[in-house]
Amino acid sequence: MLEGKKCLVIGSGISGIGAAVLLEKNHADVVLYDSSDKLTGEDLKAKLPEGSRAACIAGELPENVELSIQAAVLSPGVPTDIPLVNRMRDRGVQILGEIELGFLAEQGRVIAITGTNGKTTTTTLTGEIMKAHFGKDKTFVVGNIGNPYTLEADKTSKDSVTVGEISSFQLETIHTFHPVVSAILNITPDHLNRHHTMEAYVAAKEAVASQQTKADICVLNYDNDYTRDFAGRCPATPVLFSSHQELENGYFLRGDKIIKSVNGEEHELMDIHKDMNLVGLCNVENVMAAIAIAEGMQVPMETILTVIRGFHAVEHRIEFVATKGGVDYYNDSKGTNPDAAIQGIKAMSRPTVLIGGGYDKQSEYDEWIDSFDGKVKCLVLIGQTREKIAECARKHGFDKIRFADTYEECLKLCTELARSEERRVGK
């Protein structure tokens, strides 16, 4: 566990602080570093628990400190190819991420959930199912969901279960991380500003199963080309789910029913309208994945179904906010890539006024615009990508576009545009 080694933690966000705390508990010599010139060493020190012995450096890292480092822990937001990391890698310094560091302290079993979209909903639902079966004190929900693995790993025991939402950024820096159940919900273009190529992004997602064996399970989406292809190469035993195709082995949707099939023998598990509070086909897929994961952990279907029936939308994910003046307001602000945003539009059943925009992740918007298909009444755009999105929309013949500089202005425009029979979804 890096005891006695001089460890550099790069990044002073919540993941970096968690890593520094865990390293100190395990008697490493810690340097907490942030390259921001807007911070000082004292700012970093203030983020750590009182009594921390970690050295804290902001701005430029002194060469003598860099050359003394024996291991480096990267926060998820730190690219693996920055000059500092490249220099240390060339010197043979051990490079790992917060997830790998947490796993080194893990004592129990791990479930790891990744995918372009649906991670948080599936992870949250899976966590609730595990709590219901194994107990709240034996279940830890960690990772990209906002709770660093490193803050929970040393609380685990041989009979505990850790459920992790793992991003592609976090998967770039794993080496021994070994979940007993993994899941890749889907893979569509995203974060290409970080990964540069689709091939690199896919490889990062597939890494979640890299240390698994056939004794382990990997839950995969049959309807997604990338994950279906991986089923044939996966080192774990693949378990498939589909919302479009009936499967001889796996979980699938037939009409309103989720069915489990084992060698063609079918078992009806639930009704998506009577037993689910979530909206949208994307959430049916998330529920199927959670069922597959839970059954892989030997949780009885009765327990699974009880939790699903009481489960509501995760904040910011096709989340119903309110009805005001006859207009339904939905918050889908976690739909931060075109495919996720498409799912939000599909979930709407009436004409929609849509807010879009944000920072540029080098995404293509053609399929998103095509998904409007008469449902989107008007598009209100904001942020760095608004002109790029508007140009794409006009190319596809959609010209009902308005611009806003603030979210307050967005909401005012949407309210003006909406009518009593219409919905608005914010993303």
Language model regions located:
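C-terminal helical cap/extension that packs against the catalytic core
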Residues: 42-54, 366-420
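Residue-level detector of alpha-helix initiation sites
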Residues: 13-14, 79, 117-121, 284, ...
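Phosphate-binding loop of NTP-binding sites
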Residues: 6, 22-25, 63-67, 76-222, ...
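N-terminal leader/targeting and accessory segments in enzymes
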Residues: 1-97, 101
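Nucleotide phosphate-binding/pyrophosphate-handling subdomain across enzymes
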Residues: 3-6, 18-26, 273-377
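Beta-strand->loop->alpha-helix junctions that form or flank phosphate-binding loops
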Residues: 34, 58-60, 96-100, 142, ...
